[in-house]
């Protein structure tokens, strides 16, 4: 069906576009995902794809995870809600296995560059709204400047972007002075942006990411890793708590909710 189409290059082009659109538009990202899935389903070579998927433990775990949700429908008290959850989990059996068969190591730097470019656009817009240089638009408000998506989605994506940039700073031995300076500024601005927006899940992911990064940097030095974690994490947390009214309110709210929580309520 696609004899005259270079499918591999087409998939790489679509993946780069997907990486760029993910932080900017849910609709655009979903549209690219649909195109990728349709192309994959009609591109043939099914036995090779199937063998590639079932011979990977992570992909098998992804499929089993989805199937567990599916089997759980047999004893759910709310079938409509159960179907809703299963619908949200489709990518464990559909998207992830498909991506596994088409992602190419040689193009990973292109995926990351496209993703970080999009993050830089969202960040610039976020600061423009926060400094009241432009009027808030779409999801953004001055007090919670996340224009292209809600803070619930934005902050976890921002945490992932921070990890990618910091990983490049600490582990890329060939990084130039200019790129090092650019990435250092970018990481600081993203970390600050993390705490002027209100996504608690993303902020938790940020601190978890820092723990992982510190352990990676201080590989096999457990004592140094623990000491660094116990200094850096509380240091950033309390600095953000004092500097950001929004972060302070979110922390206080989470603390109060934890105190008021009663099992079974």
Q: Where are the regions that the model predicts?
A:
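Transmembrane signal-anchor hairpin modules in multi-pass inner-membrane enzymes, especially those
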Residues: 1-80, 101-113, 168-181, 223-230
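Aromatic-anchored transmembrane helix interface
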Residues: 58-65, 79-103, 110, 114, ...
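Membrane-embedded alpha-helical segments of multi-pass membrane proteins
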Residues: 27-46, 86-98, 153-162, 204-211
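Alpha-helical transmembrane segments of multi-pass inner-membrane proteins
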Residues: 70, 107-138, 149-219, 228-246
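Membrane-interface helix caps and helix-loop-helix hairpins in membrane proteins
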Residues: 75-83, 193-197
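Juxtamembrane membrane-water interface segments that cap and precede transmembrane helices
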Residues: 11-16, 135-147
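Flexible juxtamembrane loops connecting transmembrane helices in multi-pass membrane enzymes
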Residues: 240-265
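Generic structural signal for conserved hydrophobic packing positions in ordered secondary structure
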Residues: 20, 98-99, 150, 251
């Amino acid at each position: 069906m696609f004899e005259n189409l270079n499918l591999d290059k087409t998939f790489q082009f679509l993946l780069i576009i997907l990486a760029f659109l993910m932080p900017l538009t849910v609709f655009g990202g979903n549209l690219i995902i649909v195109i990728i899935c349709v192309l994959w389903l009609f591109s043939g070579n099914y036995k090779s794809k199937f063998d590639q998927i079932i011979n990977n433990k992570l992909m098998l775990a992804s499929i089993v995870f989805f199937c567990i949700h599916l089997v759980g429908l047999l004893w759910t008290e709310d079938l409509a809600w159960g179907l809703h959850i299963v619908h949200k989990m489709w990518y464990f059996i559909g998207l992830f296995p498909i991506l596994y068969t088409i992602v190419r190591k040689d193009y990973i730097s292109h995926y990351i560059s496209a993703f970080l470019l999009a993050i830089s656009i969202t960040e610039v817009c976020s600061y423009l709204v926060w400094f009241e240089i432009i009027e808030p638009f779409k999801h953004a408000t001055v007090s919670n400047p996340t224009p292209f998506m809600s803070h619930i989605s934005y902050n976890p994506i921002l945490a992932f972007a921070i990890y990618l940039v910091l990983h490049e700073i600490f582990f890329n031995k060939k990084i130039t002075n200019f790129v090092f300076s650019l990435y250092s500024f970018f990481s600081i601005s993203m970390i600050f942006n993390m705490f002027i927006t209100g996504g608690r899940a993303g902020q938790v992911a940020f601190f978890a990411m820092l723990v992982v990064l510190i352990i990676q940097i201080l590989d096999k030095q457990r004592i140094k890793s623990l000491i660094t974690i116990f200094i850096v994490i509380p240091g950033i947390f309390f600095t953000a708590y004092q500097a950001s009214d929004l972060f302070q309110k979110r922390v206080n709210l989470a603390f109060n909710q934890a105190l008021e929580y009663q099992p079974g309520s």
